[in-house]
Curated annotation (Swiss-Prot):
Keyword Acetylation: no
Keyword terms, alphabetized: Cytoplasm, Elongation factor, Protein biosynthesis
GO MF annotation, one: translation elongation factor activity
Gene designation per UniProt: efp
Protein name as it appears in the record: Elongation factor P
Presence of the UniProt keyword Transport in the record: no
Amino acid sequence: MVKVIASSLRKGNVVDIDDKLYVVLTAENIHPGKGTPVTQLDMRRISDGVKISERYRTTEQVERAFVEDRPHTFLYEDSDGYTFMNPENFDQVIVTKDVMGDSAVYLQEGMECMLSTHNGVPIAIELPARVTLEIVDTEPTVKGQTASSSYKPAKLSNGVRTMVPPHISAGTRVVIMTADNSYVERAKD
């Protein structure tokens, strides 16, 4: 554990408060016209997912936990959770469903992810920013609909719904942002 000033915390940092680990979701430095500047932290407790909001004076000390980030390759999913392999030493790590969260729908066999561990225990996983998926269902294009920049709903091969341009049809492979399920472009493969 390392003590740091609250204003140096950023999104993704892990802090130790009362022997519980929290991941920082947002960190905002607020400088009011009158009074001392403060740092507003929105955090999620790693053990059970409870979200909290804390305010610290910018010079206050906070304990930042040592977190190790290493690339891992996704292998498979089973009843225990999601199995990842470290490509350096071929060790396999099981990540539980609650650590994986909503991003599990984007996992594909062989996908490279960044796994964060604290004392050897997986606490967070970061997927690639973009994934390529196939459109399995979408509304047909209506003639003249392309005049305006309208989007239509589409269902991806992993079950996620997104909005795509009118020229995209079922069977087309598209690139999707994993952070917000948004369409980026047609896949170039």
